[in-house]
Amino acid sequence: MRLIIFGPPGAGKGTQAGLLEERHGITQISTGDILREAMAQETELGQKAKSYIDAGELVPDALVRDLAEQAIADEGHDDFMLDGYPRTDQQAEWLTEFLASNETPLDGVLSMKVPDDVLVRRLSRRRVHEETGETYHLDHDPPPEDVDPDLIVQRSDDEPETIQNRLDVYREETAPLATYYEERDLLVPVDGTGGIEEVFGRIEEALDALER
């Protein structure tokens, strides 16, 4: 299947996409992860992206598109789930045309629905290991007891005072994608509240419905 998963920060997109890859073989394509990996490996695209980031500039949309295109091609244009892309109607239109040119249209777009108060709690309870980058959650995935607590920190964008701004940006820039895909009969709303396995069960039900 060819899928997109999107929703506000804290909706659990990455967690659920990872489970789909682990249990159903649907490869998670996270443009953020791809970008970081490309820079770490110093690929041509990665070096270009790093030059913008080092200069304090946003990575151009065309460069992100190139990364997404290569990742999709690497998967043979099938059995993938995009996480973090597209973010705008313009990106969605490009993706539609790109997939159509390969006769591999999307099968569905999972839209994660979570109330703001739940999002704020999820995000404000996330922690990261300062040295390894390993992420944890104080409620359902706390750091092991043998980890130095002084190295467990909160990301600046997960601090309560910045979370609302992130949600506002999401609504302004990304939420309109729901309309774009709803008009194309691809949107599948998913209740993202509850435990990880509970939400995953709803996603599996949604995928079963798409396959029928």
UniProtKB/Swiss-Prot annotation:
It is found in: Cytoplasm. It catalyses: AMP + ATP = 2 ADP. The keyword Amino-acid biosynthesis does not apply. Pfam families: ADK. The keyword Metal-binding does not apply. One of its GO terms (cellular component) is cytoplasm. GO terms for molecular function: adenylate kinase activity; ATP binding. Coiled coil: none annotated. InterPro entries: Adenyl_kin_sub, Adenylat/UMP-CMP_kin, Adenylat_kinase_CS, ADK_active_lid_dom_sf, P-loop_NTPase. It comes from the Bacteria. Residues 30-59 are annotated as: NMP. Consists of three domains, a large central CORE domain and two small peripheral domains, NMPbind and LID, which undergo movements during catalysis. The LID domain closes over the site of phosphoryl transfer upon ATP binding. Assembling and dissambling the active center during each catalytic cycle provides an effective means to prevent ATP hydrolysis. NCBIfam families: adk, PRK00279.1-3, PRK14527.1. This is Adenylate kinase. It comes from Salinibacter ruber (strain DSM 13855 / M31).
